[in-house]
Amino acid sequence: MARNYGFCADHESETVKKTAASKIFDTARDLFYRRGVRAVGVDEIVCEAGVTKPSLYRAFKSKDDLVAACLKESAREGSEAIHAAIAAAGPDPRDRLRAVIRYYADKIGSPDFRGCPMTNVAVELPEPGHPGRAVVEDCKTALRGLTVDLARDLRVTDPEALADGLMLIIEGAIATHHIFGSQGPAQSLTVTCDALIQSHLERRMA
């Protein structure tokens, strides 16, 4: 059923004004993740947040800037969680690399998983000049760099190839989840990554 945006408030109380930016941000982030940045418009965001459109443009210069802000927060949260998982894994290089894999396996297995926010937006925003696209590229580049560093700690002969292979498996698991869910090919994420790591270790010892 189409939403009637005509019932959105025209005036804001002082309380709403104080919290408008955070309401807009939280609402937009949820809508963008669940439905996509292209499908969600400014009218829907302000209606869901219970604020007026001028409030949005006081807090964010444009919808594109709001998209970028939401992605930056997702990137920050993801980076903190991954680094925490690595730290908790202890000193063993293999365990530290596997911590990244387990992080994604756990995310994919969660009931509210709707894909990687960065990968989703990369498909929706192919234009290189979009501020959201820049956040996505920075995030994925940082993840690749981290994975290469962890693979290098294993002393394998080609850490870049191992890291790229692991990223391909992870991205493939995320993509197939959209079709098959967590019980499809994505459930093989950990074992497939382990097999790839083992093959690189055996190549090192050959």
Set out the residue ranges of the language-model regions.
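Helix-turn-helix
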Residues: 2, 23, 27-65, 69
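N-terminal intrinsically disordered/low-complexity leader segments
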Residues: 1-19, 201-206
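Hydrophobic/aromatic-rich alpha-helical bundle segments in the mid-to-C-terminal region
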Residues: 131-141, 152-206
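Hydrophobic alpha-helical connector segments
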Residues: 69, 83-112, 153, 159, ...
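Short, basic, alpha-helical segments at the C-terminal edge of helix-turn-helix-like DNA-binding modules
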Residues: 72-79
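Amphipathic alpha-helical segments used for helix-helix packing
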Residues: 95, 110-131
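Conserved acidic functional residues
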Residues: 43, 120, 171
